[in-house]
Amino acid sequence: MNLRINIFYTTCGSPKQSKKLAKAMLSDKMIVCVNVVKNVESYYRDSGSLKKSNESILLIKTFHTKKKIENLIKKNHPYDIPFLVQLETKKVNSEYILWARKNT
């Protein structure tokens, strides 16, 4: 049995946006689960000046490929240019994999 699952990391500007994006992904049965970490401070440079934003982090668990998740994120994400990265996993416990496959 393949004990791998894909994990993607992205951010949203508000808990409301995060909830909407999570529901869209779950409704499409594209993901197993999404963890939302609220109230993260992000610092960055935009248009030549320093910015600070409060964001939520989304950790997305799925069996789908980056291309499929990327298309779904682009379609539903509130940002014009969302950040999305795939985190490599080595081995996930088999009980979780069985549960995840049964529920997606």
Predicted regions and their residues:
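Positively charged, small/polar-rich N-terminal and surface patches that mediate targeting and assembly
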Residues: M1-T104
